[in-house]
Regions:
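Polar, glycine-rich mid-to-C-terminal structural blocks
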Residues: 93, 145-147, 278
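N-terminal Rossmann-like or analogous alpha/beta NTP/dinucleotide-binding catalytic cores
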Residues: 1-114, 211-212, 216-229, 280
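Residues that form generic nucleotide/phosphate-binding pockets
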Residues: 60, 84, 107, 126, ...
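Active-site cores that bind ATP or allylic diphosphates and position pyrophosphate for catalysis
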Residues: 103-248, 256-261
Length: 288
């Protein structure tokens, strides 16, 4: 079987060294095994995605000396997401949710609500008549999303497992995340649904990604079982940390690869530094 990996950034900002590490891991894993490396642009968030960031992603990866066998865009696969949603709706596994973020936050801050930010299932308890009335409001411009009925879904699938290169066999517990959102009015598919369908459609055999998505894999395994999709092997890796010990992130102002390039740094040397860091298994920001 041909090994296929992918790097799937969102074009909502410039890439930083943490992205470089993940891309290099996925690229080198495939190339070392004579496999294919795919670049997938996760541009489904229309409100935040920018064309200039797509061009920046391509430029940054080429600067690092990476190449890929295919370039794809999530925005070209909207019909496939809708088909999957329709199939889950037909089986009674999704329900419309009309709660605002403020309402959910208020319910979770109530006494004895627990520490985990898990949706309390408010709209799951609506009667068919109540849900129909609220959907009328939606057609008049109201907001809504579609959530998976986790208890009903787990009753269909039964116990689930998946394999991780470091953790071994993982007993999936998607129920711990509650009735997660699979689509919103302004987003035809959530990350959970889109990434699961995309990996299957592209034949990805090995998913190489950060530890921050380890728990999300439980939900992806559930969707694979419900939709009859193959389960890839997973390789979750530690996130790159800055000198302060905190993870690098766009929102915290991590230095971008573009800024490094503009300072005249050599992308191939930067990539070599990342590989040397990975060989030492210490994902800390290399000193300049």
């Amino acid at each position: 079987m041909t090994v296929i990996t992918r790097f799937a950034p969102s074009p909502t900002g410039r890439l930083h060294l943490g992205h470089a590490m993940s891309a290099i891991r996925a690229h080198d894993f495939a190339r070392a095994r004579g496999g294919r490396f795919l670049l997938r642009i996760e541009d489904i968030d229309v409100g935040r995605s920018r064309p200039e960031h797509v061009a920046g992603i391509v430029e940054d990866l080429r600067w690092l000396g990476l190449d890929w066998d295919d370039l794809s865009f999530q925005s070209a696969r909207l019909a496939s997401y809708q088909m999957a949603l329709d199939a889950l709706k037909m089986r009674g596994l999704l329900y419309p949710c009309f709660c605002t973020r403020a309402e959910i936050a208020a319910s979770l801050s109530a006494p004895h609500a627990g520490d985990a930010a898990v949706y309390p299932g408010t709209c799951r308890r609506l009667t068919p008549a109540e849900a129909a009335a609220r959907m009328h409001d939606v057609r008049m411009g109201g907001a809504h999303c579609w959530r998976i009925d986790m208890a009903a879904a787990l009753a269909v699938t039964g116990p689930l497992w998946w394999e991780d290169a470091r953790a071994g066999t993982v007993c999936a517990d998607p129920g711990a995340q509650g009735d997660v959102v699979l689509a919103r009015k302004d987003a035809p598919a959530s990350y959970h649904l889109a990434v699961t369908l995309d990996d299957a459609a592209q034949g990805v055999t090995d998913v190489v990604r950060g530890d921050d998505l380890f728990a999300a894999t439980d939900v992806h395994r559930l969707l694979q079982a419900l939709l009859g999709l193959l389960t890839p092997r997973y390789h979750h890796h530690p996130l790159m940390l800055g000198a302060d010990g905190e993870r690098l992130a766009k929102r915290t102002g991590a230095p971008s690869l573009a800024a490094m390039r503009e300072r005249g740094e050599d992308g191939l040397k930067v990539a070599a530094g990342v590989r040397a860091m990975l060989a030492g298994d210490a994902p800390h920001l290399p000193s300049s």
